Swiss-Prot record:
EC number: 2.7.8.45
Source organism phylogeny: Bacteria, Bacillati, Bacillota, Bacilli, Bacillales
Keyword Cell membrane attached: yes
Name of the protein this chain belongs to: Teichoic acid glycerol-phosphate transferase
One Pfam family named in its UniProt record: Glyphos_transf
Annotated function: Catalyzes the addition of a second glycerol phosphate unit from CDP-glycerol to the prenolpyrophosphate-linked disaccharide, to complete the linkage unit.
GO process annotations (BP): cell wall organization; teichoic acid biosynthetic process
Pathway in which this enzyme or protein is active: Cell wall biogenesis; poly(ribitol phosphate) teichoic acid biosynthesis
Keyword terms: Cell membrane, Cell wall biogenesis/degradation, Membrane, Teichoic acid biosynthesis, Transferase
GO MF term (any one): CDP-glycerol glycerophosphotransferase activity
Topology versus the membrane: Peripheral membrane protein
Recorded family membership: Belongs to the CDP-glycerol glycerophosphotransferase family.
Length: 389
């Protein structure tokens, strides 16, 4: 009771401080934040890099305490969240470019343009479309009310395709005129670098991946009912890594990429398995991967830009589809690759990856046309020209 009261008082004081400081606007300042200040990544990063080349504005990142080293390594200007410099930056900024929800106790001035980039094409139900929220620390009503409050503050919401646009309007309670249907800025790199052998080999070299090996990335999503604490989830790899190693020859390297909400990390197995969950730019990992193994993650849509083979390891399909989230699309009919539901089927699909690639050429093309047709490498430009016209 006392703890909750103190929390509310702190939130109210932050709201009041933001409101006061917003009366001293900095019309040349743009504020960026990715995954709650833990990463230099995703759509905000792509927009930041575009603006460094095409704008004279002052660009600043908001960073969670403990993650400053990431931005120091890249020589990127930042302020630590809840520091004095942060209080003097975020509420006064001309624009916010953020890819996740922000607390409603962060006051946003009408003079600040809030661009919500979001972070994926939705396969699983999101926002107000989740009829039974099973996330730790909230319930269905509070979760949905929070989304409504948040989306009312957005001036623009980025959509990667028409499919997402139609979903976002209801799931986020946002009007069509606020949605910028442009493609995703983070996918500009995929269009620009997909055939750049020197760039791709450079990434492999940094990760100590032999240039002659096939790279398979496993990138599953998180499960709502596997929370360790509020906002943090565990994930158990549902296959035997040693069995996979024995079944595949020495020509393969497996990359494990966990969702940003998953705190579980996997032990690496010699040079066969590499945990790349902390590698900041997943676009680089797409570029070096010959194939993707996922489940219900939106990575399938980004990887679809490259039209490379995908395998869908959906070992808990019925539970996930019926009990946890539910899907917007027909999961069993619209995917650009085979669904496998156990370890044996997964290994067989990986061993026959070339045959699978040929079998699903048409499916990948149809998938690309529906979800990736806007990804022409110019999304960042389109967004910035609209916001700062």
């Amino acid at each position: 009771m006392i703890k909750n009261t103190i929390k509310k008082l702190i939130e109210h004081s932050i709201y009041t401080t933001f409101k006061l400081l917003s009366k001293l606007p900095n019309k040349n300042l743009i504020y960026f934040e990715s995954f709650h200040g833990k990463q230099y990544s995703d759509n905000p990063k792509a927009l930041y890099e575009y603006l460094t080349e095409h704008s004279d504005a002052q660009l600043i990142w908001g960073v969670k305490k403990g993650y400053e080293h990431i931005f120091q390594q890249h020589n990127v200007p930042y302020v630590t969240k809840f520091s004095m410099k942060w209080f003097l930056a975020m509420p006064r900024a001309k624009a916010w470019m953020i890819n996740t929800r922000t607390p409603d106790w962060l006051y946003k001035s009408p003079r600040t343009t809030y661009l919500q980039t979001w972070h994926g094409t939705p396969l699983k139900k999101i926002g107000l479309d989740i009829s039974n929220v099973k996330m730790l620390g909230t319930n269905t009503q509070n979760y949905q009310d929070g989304f409504k409050k948040e989306s009312q503050r957005w001036d623009y919401l980025v959509s990667p395709n028409p499919y997402s646009t139609s979903i976002f309007q209801n799931a986020f309670h946002v009007s069509r005129d606020k949605i910028l249907e442009t493609g995703y800025p983070r996918n500009d790199k995929l269009s620009h670098k997909r055939n750049d052998t020197e760039y791709i080999n450079g990434i492999k070299t940094r990760l100590n991946i032999p240039l002659d090996k096939k790279v398979i990335m496993y990138a599953p999503t998180w499960r709502d009912d596997e929370a360790i604490r509020e906002g943090s989830y565990q994930f158990n790899v549902n296959f035997d890594i040693e069995a996979l190693r024995q079944a595949l020859d020495d020509d393969y390297v497996i990359l494990l990429r966990m969702h940003y909400l998953v705190v579980t990390r996997i032990d690496e197995h010699d040079d066969f398995v590499k945990d790349v969950s902390d590698y900041e730019d997943i676009s680089d990992l797409y570029l070096i991967s010959d194939a993707l193994v996922t489940d219900y993650s939106s990575v399938m849509f980004d990887f679809g830009v490259l039209k490379r083979p995908q395998i869908f390891y959906a070992y808990d399909l019925d539970k996930y589809g019926d009990e946890l989230r539910g899907f917007y699309m027909d999961y069993k009919k619209e995917l650009p690759g085979p669904i496998v539901e156990n370890q044996t089927a997964l290994i067989d699909a990986l061993k026959q990856i070339d045959e699978t690639a040929n079998e699903y050429i048409e499916a990948r093309t149809v998938f690309y046309q529906k979800f990736c047709s806007l990804e022409d490498g110019q999304a960042s430009q389109r967004i910035c020209q609209t916001i700062f016209k």
